């Protein structure tokens, strides 16, 4: 992440290079045929451990809540820890066996992959799209947050009810929706639309998610530049989250929270599909394993719960490393998901609604290190105003504006 964030205070390289792979040829196989072709051996894994260990990670969680969130640096932050270990026989057969098990266990993953980077390998089943754009310019983002760790027998109605009525889990999801609305408000030609919420059920976890859709005329490079990185793996506001990560991260993030993307060139345009690199195992040339996971920390977080959430997120990879694959379970809780939508602003969920009246004139929004300004801009444009956003406006600019809006930013509102 640090290589992409050169302009942020978090410039801290971890030795993980940006990699572009030119596809010379491709072959498409059905999931069923691929599963038949892949090997299935039990990998020899040893020295499994968490870095940092539970107690140390819990102390870190408390420091971030008490000092960074309470101190006004931001509303939520994601700090990773890693499951570490050693692959006894680091062979392609072992790697493909892990990939096969993830493919079997996690049919709901957005993208499942084995990717040879030259010096290391990434194997993962990511639940989360980063951004997708088709050749016509239709664009989608997929904020996911909130985690229900299933019981050993699978998800239950009682467990789903407790999860979907938990205010902390609801607030976590709404925070990341706001952050990705900021991104799409910056990228899209017109206001983006919210679809959802939905339950994203994985083999051993359930998350909640929304889809945000819109249309853009931006090129791929600008879409990636303006959308990196997802708040679900970093926090918000994004600038503050970079700073907190630089201060608090115990181990290098490497590819955690980056993206694995595919760009295709068509006669009528360029398309992009990408997944966030979470739930991803990195294996280096010596067979060292690294599986980073994180928890979203908010003011109401409890250290013990966040520690448990991170260990819960390693259950699938532990099963892929040590157990035969198992199937998933049916979803529950659709009515409770629908109730969550009641708290969302209709501007983002019902784009067909016309404003009760239109305005004219010029609005100037002062940007104070929080991209909520771009959401405000889309709302004011919808009302008929001509809007400009500036982080350092001249006094004359403010004088000429019919409406001056001071955008939000980091800090403690009680100061």
Where does each model-flagged region fall?
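Flexible gly/pro-rich beta->alpha loop and the following alpha-helix that scaffold active-site loops
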Residues: 362-363, 370-415
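Short hydrophobic beta-strand that contains or immediately precedes a catalytic carboxylate
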Residues: 79, 175-177, 365
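Non-catalytic accessory segments adjacent to catalytic cores
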Residues: 1-89, 93, 189, 195-198, ...
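Hydrophobic multi-pass inner-membrane translocation pores used for secretion
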Residues: 250, 324, 360-365, 369-372
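RNA-binding accessory domains that recognize and position tRNA/RNA substrates
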Residues: 330-368
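Conserved hydrophobic core element of enzyme catalytic domains
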Residues: 213-334
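Contiguous alpha-helical scaffold segments within structured protein domains
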Residues: 25-48, 86, 148-151, 155-246, ...
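An anion-binding catalytic pocket shared by soluble metabolic enzymes
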Residues: 78-171, 186, 263-293
